[in-house]
């Protein structure tokens, strides 16, 4: 790192603070962990108070317009802060900066931003900082050739859960999705690098590992090593000390019987599967370029439940895709009832630049909102019934943090990803404990320590 070893800036960062705001998915969260490590390695310390920070960074998401608009608003709110203290450094990174449309908005309308870099340029941050400090002029790096498939240090959100990237990018080109443009085409990391990273995490006391990829099921497809995702998952599950193993996200078209077998045969692989549906209509699924139909999706869900009793299935659902009719929407509701999802991430369709769907005429906002409301009215009772099944049962819970509303209550997750509230001492955070479930809502279950 040129900046760290530069005599001029040797002690520059000792009393400096940084603040990171992250939008979007787990991969963005993990990228922020990597950025955090780099900044602290330079000498920065973290602060949750943006006004108190010397270095302010926004790690962006472009999947939906809402996150994009939030970013513009929050950056604009810093103009006065930057005017009052020009030495503050403001940076914007992530998926938005990989696309020319969003990047140009920042470049032209937000002069307060000093450093711009993309998803493939995180390791270059020290050099970008050095260049900015030397010239005082805006620095931009969104080049495509900076990715190294090596072990990368990062600051995890805690000392018992960690994300591990197994691949980058996506080759599916769903008609509504900008990820192939913002994250690039699929690249799989070498299995040996992934195994080494997990082994190091376990040595340092981490209990739960989550493997990350835009579509983990296509891991290894274009690589010179002959390892599939089920094979990689099994290798990871065999690492001594891995108490819980998760992964996300899986494309339904690539879900194999072999993957189901691996989950079934390895007790430390969590009984939770995120299977994005998006729509229950064959016509809309075809328009979305999802490459599966309603019956194929239902069969995948049925097989998961049949082979792995008690498995929890979550999904993603988009309402209001431009070609969706009321009949199509009813097909989506039908799948929700037949599968009985444990939870769902629901979204109103958001047109993204340079995607095929963005060229289509949108559905009236009132119709979309009405369908969205009816979707939630259908899902919430299903969630409630699924959670009610836990009452009276003893479950293992990895305690993660204090409740925001009551410091005497800790929150954690079951292996089925149920959010659990339990009265317990904060010294138990990071431990897996047994909890007897006594109550539930549509979104949580609660109980007592056993």
Task: Give residue ranges: language-model regions.
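Conserved, mostly hydrophobic/aromatic
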Residues: 174, 194, 211, 247, ...
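Short acidic/polar active-site loop segments enriched in Thr and Asp
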Residues: 207, 243, 342
């Amino acid at each position: 790192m040129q900046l760290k070893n530069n005599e001029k800036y040797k002690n520059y960062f000792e009393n400096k603070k940084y603040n990171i705001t992250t939008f979007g998915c787990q991969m963005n969260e993990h990228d922020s962990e990597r950025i955090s490590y780099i900044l602290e390695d330079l000498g920065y310390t973290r602060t949750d108070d943006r006004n108190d920070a010397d270095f302010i960074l926004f790690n962006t998401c472009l999947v939906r317009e809402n996150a994009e608009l939030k970013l513009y608003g929050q950056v604009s709110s810093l103009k006065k802060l930057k005017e009052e203290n020009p030495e503050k450094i403001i940076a914007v990174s992530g998926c938005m900066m990989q696309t020319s449309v969003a990047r140009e908005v920042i470049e032209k309308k937000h002069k307060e931003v000093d450093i711009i870099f993309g998803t493939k340029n995180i390791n270059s941050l020290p050099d970008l900082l050095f260049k900015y400090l030397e010239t005082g002029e805006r620095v931009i790096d969104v080049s495509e050739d900076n990715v190294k498939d090596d072990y990368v240090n990062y600051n995890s959100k805690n000392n018992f859960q960690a994300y591990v990237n197994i691949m980058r990018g996506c080759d599916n080109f769903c008609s509504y999705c900008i990820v192939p443009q913002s994250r690039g085409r699929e690249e799989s990391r070498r299995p040996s690098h992934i195994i080494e990273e997990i082994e190091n995490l376990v040595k340092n006391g981490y209990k739960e590992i989550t493997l990350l990829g835009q579509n983990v099921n296509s891991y290894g497809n274009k690589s010179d090593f002959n390892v599939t995702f089920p094979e990689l998952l099994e290798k990871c599950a065999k690492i001594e000390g891995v108490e819980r193993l998760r992964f996300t996200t899986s494309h339904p078209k690539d879900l194999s019987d072999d993957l189901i077998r691996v989950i079934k045969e390895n007790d430390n692989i969590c009984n939770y599967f995120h299977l994005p549906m998006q729509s229950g209509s064959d016509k809309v699924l075809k328009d979305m370029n999802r490459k599966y139909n309603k019956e194929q999706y239902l069969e995948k869900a049925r097989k998961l439940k049949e082979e792995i009793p008690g498995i929890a299935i979550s999904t993603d659902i988009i309402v209001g895709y431009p070609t969706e009719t009321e009949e199509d929407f009813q097909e989506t509701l039908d799948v929700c009832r037949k599968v009985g999802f444990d939870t769902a991430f629901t979204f109103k369709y958001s047109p993204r630049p340079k995607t095929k769907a963005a060229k289509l005429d949108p559905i009236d906002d009132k119709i979309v909102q009405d369908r969205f409301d009816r979707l939630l009215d259908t899902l919430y009772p299903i969630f409630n019934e699924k959670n009610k099944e836990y009452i009276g049962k003893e479950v293992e819970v990895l305690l993660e943090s204090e409740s925001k509303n009551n410091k005497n209550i800790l929150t954690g997750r079951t292996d089925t990803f149920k959010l659990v509230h339990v009265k317990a001492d904060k010294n138990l955070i990071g431990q897996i404990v047994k909890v007897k479930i006594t109550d539930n809502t549509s979104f949580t279950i609660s109980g007592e320590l056993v």
